[in-house]
Each structure stands twice: as C-alpha cells, then as structure tokens.
Amino acid sequence: MSTVPPAHKITFLRHGESVGNAENRFQGHADFPLTDRGRDQATALAERWKSEGLVFDFAIASPLLRARETAEIIAAALDLPLEFDPLWKELDNGLMAGLNQEEAAQRVPRPDFMTPYTRFGQTGESRWEMFLRAGQRVQNLLDRPPGRYLVVSHGGILNMAMYCTLSITPQADFAGPRFSFGNTGFARMRYEHATHNWRLTFFDNGF
C-alpha cells in the first residue's frame, strides 16, 4: 500500500485592514487594531475556508493587535489552537512607526539609495535582518511535526518568508520580486521532505 510522503503545508496570511492601513500610516511595530472592515474581512475569510473544508492543525500569529485580532477571529471560527510568536512581528521600521507619508518625509527622510543592510527609520531593522528573522521562523515551522500550519502576520515579514522558501535574497533599493499581500491576502506553501523542495500552490492577494 502506498503512503503519502510527509509534508509541511503552510499558509502565510496577512492581517485584515487596520487603523494604520486606513490612515495610510507606516506601521511597523506601531500597534494599530483592526478596523470594522478588517474584522469583517477576517470573518469572511474564516467562513470561506470553513465552506471549502480547509483544515489546519495549528495557528501561529504575530502578537501585534492587527495580526492578533485576525488570528483570533479565524482560530475561533475554525476551532484552532493558537500561539503568538513575537518573531513574526512586522519589520521594525524605527522612527517611522506610526507616521503618515508626509510626517515620515519630514522627520525621517528616506536615503537616496538603500542597501539590504540599511536600517529603516534610522533605528529600525534592515531588510537583511528581517530576512534572517523570517528564515529562522520558517525553520521553526519545519522543526515541528509535518502538518497544516497557519501563520498570521504582516506584509513585510511574509515577503521575506516567501524569499526564504523560494531561495530569493534581498536586493539593493528594493529590486527583486514583491509578493502583493493585500489585507487578508495569503499564500499556500508546501514543503516536500522527500525532495527538500518548496512549492507555491496557491496565492490570493486579498483586499
């Protein structure tokens, strides 16, 4: 009798619309809650997945409010165990956190050229540091038993998680691909242990 080789099936999900999104602010570690629209987005996605018969074994989320609330809504609807991991927080964008575009341009002007090692907002992380952090969290998932995992997080760190799985490295001045995770956008990844290969099996850019 044939057996299915073990695999990790991982869904990377960005949070619903936050107050920071609605006000067009740089969020980073600034802790904005969901808007009513964001809560509706999370509820609608949970209902969609439930109707599709989609099953997860475990959920992991950033503890920042916008991700926490999204994860709690979905975990409650799908009866999922949920843990919070601070290493799944968004990019630390330093002095830019919470500022709108105009405020950031005045207080923390962007350098003319950014290497992968340039810190955001003068005191924050670089994209390279975020890439390494994402790689550690992806490895943490693979260190767990094969199964179906949901990760609820943020657009920046999820892009770096995708980079890690697809063998892409950050480039200077944001060259390279960008995965457009809209609010409640998600990517489904599969890691085959027999071949040590990752596959992107589905992408939905959300709202």
Label every model-predicted segment.
Residues I10, G147-G156:
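Generic beta-sheet signal
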Residues A61-S62, L132, V152-S153:
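Short beta-strand scaffold positions
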Residues T169-N197:
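Domain-level recognition of soluble alpha/beta enzyme cores
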Residues E52-V55, L141-G147:
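Glycine-rich phosphate-binding loop signature in dinucleotide/nucleotide-binding domains
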Residues E52-L87, P109, R188-F207:
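Conserved histidine-centered catalytic loops in small-molecule metabolism enzymes
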Residues A76-Q136, R190:
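Phosphate-handling substructures
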Residues R14-P81:
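Active-site-proximal alpha-helix that buttresses catalytic centers in soluble enzyme cores
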Residues V4-T11, F58:
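Extreme N-terminal starter segment of soluble prokaryotic enzymes
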